[in-house]
Amino acid sequence: MDLSITVNGIKFPNPFLLGSGPPGTNARVLAKSYDAGWGGAVAKTVSLESSKVVNVVPRYGKLRSRNNGEVIGFENIELISDRPIEVWLDEFRQVKKEYPNHVLVASIMEEYDKERWQELTRVVQDTGVDAFELNFSCPHGMTERKMGSEMGEHPDLTEEVTSWVKEVAKIPVWAKMTPNITNIKEPSLAAVRGGADGISAINTILSVIGVNLDTLRPMPTVEGYTVPGGYSSQAVKPIALRMVSQLALALPKETSISGIGGIETSHDAIEFMLLGSSTVQICTGVMLKGVKMVDELQEGLAKFMTDKGFNSVQEIVGKSLPYFSTHMDLVKMMKEAKRHKAGEAARDNEWAQKDITEKTAELTSN
């Protein structure tokens, strides 16, 4: 089955992309992902001065289910790429030469300086990459240099920096947005005003993964200390779905969305597509499951399309958006459907502590 989709004029063999991070940290791992069947990849974020980037060890932390030990949450305090830009430029050229039909998106980040943003845009663009993703959303480390989410949390900066890039970019530009904000629509719309062709959402959620009760130190612990980091994996998916749906309902129709956040299965990916994502990105899932997880993604999407009668991936995008409403309308529709008696169980005076779990199950839809 044809799983291709064209987004911002770029044809993706399928809608599944490696998300920016360790899975796209050099040409070798990018090549492995393409060989495995991924439709595209967003490389690890690059900047002009890698010497300022110093990563620490350990830099990851896991939140596990108390029932079976499964990883349901993942924190990282990893920074952007620490490899020289000159090395990246050579590898971008190499990857595009060897995989001309696979999409390569360059993630870029710089300090608040027009000349630096435009220089980075020019030199990376000359390598033949297919699109840019502007990292306005890394929540840790880089913010100390007024980078990452320090820009994405301020719509005026988001719009201005996007416009700087668009002045020199000849390829599509996506802006990657932070969830660490009250209203994700505001900076996203600002990026569109600045000329962004698409929005990627969401990046990780600022977090502390836990505290070691033996040492009393928060984790991940580096020489006895830590910093808050970015939270990802399964547990963030509902938050990401909410924000993606909000963006899909608010952005101009021509603005594409690349959905990110807790995607590990084809079921997850399809949910994002139904809520407006043309492509989906997976980073933590690949770190935990490996690049071969793309097999299930493709097989599951193809089966879903066959079962539901979809003729193209594009037909899926945004299909579930019309079913969002307001709470007042939900009450009205329930009453019109003569189901209001079923709702009586939700009244406060119907609840009793002895059967709270039973009442909870009674009012749950899945």
Predicted regions and their residues:
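N-terminal capping/small domains of soluble enzymes
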Residues: 1-105, 109-114, 118-119, 297, ...
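Electropositive phosphate-/nucleotide-binding environments in soluble metabolic enzymes
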Residues: 27, 82-89, 114, 155, ...
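Alpha/beta enzyme core
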Residues: 31-36, 40, 111-258, 267-277, ...
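Short secondary-structure boundary segments
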Residues: 44-46, 136, 203, 284-285
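C-terminal helical cap(s) of enzyme catalytic domains, especially alpha/beta-barrels
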Residues: 50-67, 208-228, 286-310
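Helical hairpin unit composed of two closely spaced alpha helices linked by a short loop
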Residues: 259-262, 281-283, 289
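C-terminal extensions of enzymes
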Residues: 273, 287-366
